[in-house]
């Protein structure tokens, strides 16, 4: 039963690019993307605040679902659509403050135990990864593969889910076929020879998400 402690999100979030700059946020919104995440790593709040403010403003202008990775205090301060947290960030974050501010919450998971932890927090959506090997970040866990992803999606049947990790344009149809509601991509767009074409093709496969 999908009864999150945070505001709900659509069951299908569709194509969900994760990018590290306001420039990419603006490009992708202009290309028709409506779910996306600003993920800037390892900088102090004051160093990223201007980018967070600009990204949130763009998200509002395009009526998009913009999640801020990790910088939950800034997300609350500037009223982002939502926050995305890794497992390691859950303990150090004031979830009550995020809830009280009316922000949506997404949580990363890598196995059944982490799914249990995520479910206990009753977030707005649960991310499942990493599906395939990925060069974007060092991962302590092994890739899950499509079979494991499908099992997790079935377990979380009522929950909005996001698949992430090594999802290329070629692999995207098989990932969507598991029933997952969204695919998060990074290098499939940012390292594509033609990012506009890649984005259009991925939108064709994953959609823009439900309203």
Curated annotation (Swiss-Prot):
Keywords for this entry?
Magnesium, Metal-binding, Thiamine biosynthesis, Transferase
The cofactor note reads: Binds 1 Mg(2+) ion per subunit.
User: What is the main EC category here?
Assistant: transferase
Task: Tell me what reaction this enzyme catalyses.
Answer: 2-[(2R,5Z)-2-carboxy-4-methylthiazol-5(2H)-ylidene]ethyl phosphate + 4-amino-2-methyl-5-(diphosphooxymethyl)pyrimidine + 2 H(+) = thiamine phosphate + CO2 + diphosphate; 2-(2-carboxy-4-methylthiazol-5-yl)ethyl phosphate + 4-amino-2-methyl-5-(diphosphooxymethyl)pyrimidine + 2 H(+) = thiamine phosphate + CO2 + diphosphate; 4-methyl-5-(2-phosphooxyethyl)-thiazole + 4-amino-2-methyl-5-(diphosphooxymethyl)pyrimidine + H(+) = thiamine phosphate + diphosphate
Query: Where, in this chain's numbering, is 4-amino-2-methyl-5-(diphosphooxymethyl)pyrimidine bound?
Result: 37-41, 69, 108, 137
**From what organism does this protein derive?**
Shigella boydii serotype 4 (strain Sb227)
Q: What is the lineage of its organism?
A: Bacteria, Pseudomonadati, Pseudomonadota, Gammaproteobacteria, Enterobacterales
Q: What is this protein called?
A: Thiamine-phosphate synthase
Q: Does the keyword ATP-binding apply?
A: no
